[in-house]
Amino acid sequence: MPIKLPDTLPAYDILSREGVMVMPEDGAAKQDIRPLRIGLLNLMPKKIQTETQFARLIGASPLQIELSLIRMSDHESKNTSAAHMDEFYRTFSEVQATGEKFDGLLITGAPIEHLPFEDVTYWDELIQVMDWTQTNVHSTFGICWGGMAMAYHFHGIKKHMLDAKAFGCFRHVNQAPASPYLRGFSDDVLMPVSRWTEVRSDEIAAAGLSTLIGSDDVGPALVEDADHRALYVFNHFEYDSETLKQEYDRDADAGAPINVPVNYYPGDDPTATPMNRWRSHAHLLYGNWVSELYLTTPYDIEQIGLASTDLRK
């Protein structure tokens, strides 16, 4: 089954050309099944790029996915047109007012990691979102800053500034090969990393959380928070092949301090075309997450937050 998207959303045409199974909303309505409802709280400046990246990954599932785009209520996007936001997004306040529930929620990163969490203009509303997930979302996936924000809110785990930006493709170790989220993963995992902050392994462990993937160079990468039905990934499996290149070129052109991304360009030559060596693991991770949603979410969506099941038992 495909991912259900409005046929006017830019991601619809992009993913159709890539061979991803997408279906317009009127076609999906003809199928007599309950789709998995997944929300995307998009905190990134380039909304369309981010929508497409995550729709690509969750849309590779054989299950029908209904993707809902959500934004913060009082934060206006400076990099995406108001027309796009008005047509395709709802504010969190609007979603909350309906009382609706979701099988999954993705909370993206945001380029604000230099700020203390409490200084972020929408922090108070994000706290409401995170608390709301405990009654209205079956499983939440926090990405990069979004994952750090959840770990901080639920467990007081601090983010720590790095002396230099962790930037490039770093090798990680699969530390939990029996985890259902790592089904099909190799022992050695390459992940794109782009951040000025880190969370530390000892603080993750002290909070009772499980590190599933980690690196000696850049620390924990994928963490499971079973008590809050959440995963936190601090790196960027969703990145396109040239996302790190775009970030490098942007900073280099602006004269900002930036190193050539590690283990990304062939021969570390920024004039060479980068190769995508993380795509298969990206699809595995998000496909496994969607599979776990299907196996454990209540069939009656109104039971989310009240009950769960497991079709394997």
UniProtKB/Swiss-Prot annotation:
* Catalysed transformations (reactions): L-homoserine + acetyl-CoA = O-acetyl-L-homoserine + CoA
Give the record's keywords alphabetically.
Answer: Acyltransferase, Amino-acid biosynthesis, Cytoplasm, Methionine biosynthesis, Transferase
State the pathway, as annotated in the record.
Answer: Amino-acid biosynthesis; L-methionine biosynthesis via de novo pathway; O-acetyl-L-homoserine from L-homoserine: step 1/1
List the residue(s) that the UniProt entry marks as the site Important for substrate specificity: 194
A GO MF term: homoserine O-acetyltransferase activity
> Biological process GO annotation list?
L-methionine biosynthetic process from homoserine via O-succinyl-L-homoserine and cystathionine
Give a yes or no for keyword Transferase in this entry. Answer: yes
Q: What InterPro entries does UniProt report for this protein, alphabetically?
A: Class_I_gatase-like (IPR029062), HST_MetA (IPR005697), MetA_family (IPR033752)
Q: Name the top EC class.
A: transferase
State any GO CC term. Answer: cytoplasm
Q: Where is this site: Important for acyl-CoA specificity?
A: 113
The entry's protein name is Homoserine O-acetyltransferase
UniProt organism field? Jannaschia sp. (strain CCS1)
- Give the matching HAMAP family: MetA_acyltransf (MF_00295)
| UniProt function note | Transfers an acetyl group from acetyl-CoA to L-homoserine, forming acetyl-L-homoserine.
Q: Where in the cell is it found?
A: Cytoplasm
Pfam families from the UniProt entry: HTS
Q: Which residues bind substrate?
A: 165, 194, 250
Q: What is its EC number?
A: 2.3.1.31
Catalytic residue list: 144, 236, 238
Q: Which family does it belong to?
A: Belongs to the MetA family.
